[in-house]
Amino acid sequence: MEYTEVMVRYGELSTKGKNRKDFINRLASNVEKVLKDLPQIDFHPRHDRMHIVLNGAPFAEVDKRLKKVFGIQTYSPAIKIPKTLEDIEKTSLELMQETFKPGMTFKVNTKRSDHKFEYDTNQLNNLVGDYLFDHIDHLKAEMKHPDLVLRIEVRQDAVYISNQLLHGIGGMPVGTAGKAVMMLSGGIDSPVASYLAMKRGVDIEMVHFFSPPYTTEKALAKAKELTGILANYVGKINFIAVPFAEIQETIKEKLPEGYLMTVQRRFMLQLADRIRAKRGGLAIFNGESVGQVASQTLQSMVAINDVTTTPVIRPVATMDKTEIIKLAEDIGTFDLSIQPFEDCCTIFAPPRPKTKPKLDKAREYEARLDVEGLIQRAMDGIEVMPIYPNEKFINDKIEEDQDLL
């Protein structure tokens, strides 16, 4: 049967009290964004759920996209029918025949907001159940843990019947927690951190440092394409490319090898903070995991964080690498993340970086440089572009150019 609409149930929104309306409106806006190329769809957000009227749009495509909208707890494709027992029985049978397999158990679950309807919930459960028993062989009822639940909702305008309860990804609607910047590399961790930030309702913009001619066009394209994968969850993400070669060259030329990485990261954080302030963000997110590499020891974090009072949030800080990889595979970023295109974090990496850098030394070495001039020139060279779901940037020409190197 062709579904006519989808009933969307909210996740944590039920705990948000007086702000509930704002959260529901944001979720509705986010759902509209991911379905905007299906113009026939109508949206009706309500206090307890959202109705999406398909108007002929394919449910399979809608289903694929709703699975990636934060703030949805569950949803069910449904069929809207007239309020007659004959229509209810006929539609219930057709839905059950599509999904029932011998040996399965079932339950009819009726809810009624129209209390003037001629049958109460128990009567309708029994009538529909008896009708299904008469028309489907080997059908068994199970009240506690059935394999199939046929849900019937009697509302003022019509009856809605569904036979599936699909799970969303939960979390909070993106945008309800405010705006922040994400320091996106081309690796495994920062895309996962981006996903987790969005899941908590944060509207993120990607900040990516690139260092031509030391980094290739393909490395930049990889970061953009990772952003395109993550844009599936929100409809669009702004990508901010920051030129970083002059800063890296200057640090390498003038500072001791052991502190190259520490001072480089201090510059990155200062630039991210400038961009955050300029674009109205409230926090900085990154993909650091405690102790994973030299720059991510607690001592390194102290020496690097010193340059800002802005909250620096690390969603994967306490996760094992295997946990991060599993989540990267689940969200679809892993295969691209492991492509071997060197980014600016790897090309200037010293062979023996300090794992326990001293804050006073980091400040002393950084003070030898024209910090403000270097930062301002990098800020003058930033480029901002919107990236949409699944946009491709690693094209054949880039691959050919890479082969010639």
Swiss-Prot record:
HAMAP family: ThiI. It is found in: Cytoplasm. This is Probable tRNA sulfurtransferase. InterPro entries: Rossmann-like_a/b/a_fold, ThiI_AANH, ThiI_fer, ThiI_N, THUMP_dom, THUMP_ThiI, tRNA_STrfase, tRNA_sulfurtransferase_ThiI. Its EC number is 2.8.1.4. Catalyzes the ATP-dependent transfer of a sulfur to tRNA to produce 4-thiouridine in position 8 of tRNAs, which functions as a near-UV photosensor. Also catalyzes the transfer of sulfur to the sulfur carrier protein ThiS, forming ThiS-thiocarboxylate. This is a step in the synthesis of thiazole, in the thiamine biosynthesis pathway. The sulfur is donated as persulfide by IscS. It comes from the Bacteria. NCBIfam families: tRNA uracil 4-sulfurtransferase ThiI (TIGR00342). Gene3D superfamilies: 3.30.2130.30, HUPs. Pathway: Cofactor biosynthesis; thiamine diphosphate biosynthesis. Keywords: ATP-binding, Cytoplasm, Nucleotide-binding, RNA-binding, Thiamine biosynthesis, Transferase, tRNA-binding. It is an enzyme of class 2 (transferase). ATP binds at residues 183-184, 208-209, 265, 287, 296. GO terms for cellular component: cytosol. Belongs to the ThiI family. The gene is thiI. Its main location: cytoplasm. One of its GO terms (molecular function) is tRNA binding. It catalyses: [ThiI sulfur-carrier protein]-S-sulfanyl-L-cysteine + a uridine in tRNA + 2 reduced [2Fe-2S]-[ferredoxin] + ATP + H(+) = [ThiI sulfur-carrier protein]-L-cysteine + a 4-thiouridine in tRNA + 2 oxidized [2Fe-2S]-[ferredoxin] + AMP + diphosphate; [ThiS sulfur-carrier protein]-C-terminal Gly-Gly-AMP + S-sulfanyl-L-cysteinyl-[cysteine desulfurase] + AH2 = [ThiS sulfur-carrier protein]-C-terminal-Gly-aminoethanethioate + L-cysteinyl-[cysteine desulfurase] + A + AMP + 2 H(+). Residues 60-165 form the THUMP domain. One of its GO terms (biological process) is thiamine diphosphate biosynthetic process.
